Amino acid sequence: LMFMQLGFRDGLFDTSVTIHKLLDADLVLISPRSKSSISMSGFPKRRLIQTLALEDVEKTAPVNLTYLLWRNPENLKTRSILTLGFNPSDSLLLDDGFSRKADKLKNPGRVLFDKLSRPEFGPIEDWFLSEKKVETEVAGKRVLVEGLVELGPSFGADGNLITSRETYLRLFPANPKGSIEIGLVKLRSGSNPILVSEILNKSLPNDVRVLTKDQFIEFEKNYWK
């Protein structure tokens, strides 16, 4: 029974890091004040740019993350949805078909909806697949669903939404333009993520923390333990 409980618990922790595992990154920058994906603080985007001074760093991607109110287009009830904003030309997820979908976010007001989100968000997948125009409000502003992704709910999020940083900042204007919640770093082939993270943690100011992807996954799991 104890082993069954442990297995069940591990399964729950795994659902809390679904997005973390899908991120296309070797290193992840976060604010030292961030506690988990449900409690993220911002840090200066320029810290991410500064990592490019290191030869091992191949490319970076700034990401914003917060909870915004989604309006169910069927019953008009609102519910918090985890919203990620990134530059559509950057690589965000380890998903072959994702970049094609991300391309559609270059037009403002467009979003990708996680079809594994809880049903309380509305029949979004059904409407979208029947080629019905799926338009609703996020944070009181109109958005159009341009595609579906497959991420899945977690401890902290009943549903997920992906959009461009441009649209994100329009939906959440209180977010300073030069501030991000997550910085993704891809290293050149052959680089040692642990070694590079140690170098960056020593060289960057203490308003940012550099984790390997595995450490970022553990950071989230530890919050829920």
Model-derived features: where do they sit?
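Alpha-helical transmembrane segments
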Residues: 1-27
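Extracytoplasmic
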Residues: 22-24, 46, 78-81, 106-108, ...
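Short extracytoplasmic
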Residues: 30-49
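Structural beta->alpha junctions
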Residues: 33-38, 149-152, 185-192, 203, ...
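Solvent-exposed, non-transmembrane alpha-helical starts
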Residues: 37-42, 73, 77-80, 91-95, ...
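The feature marks short, hydrophobic/small-residue-biased sequence motifs that occur predominantly
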Residues: 45-54, 58, 62-112, 137-139, ...
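Mid-to-C-terminal secondary-structure elements
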Residues: 90-97, 115-165, 169-172, 195
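Peri-transmembrane interface segments
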Residues: 193, 198-225
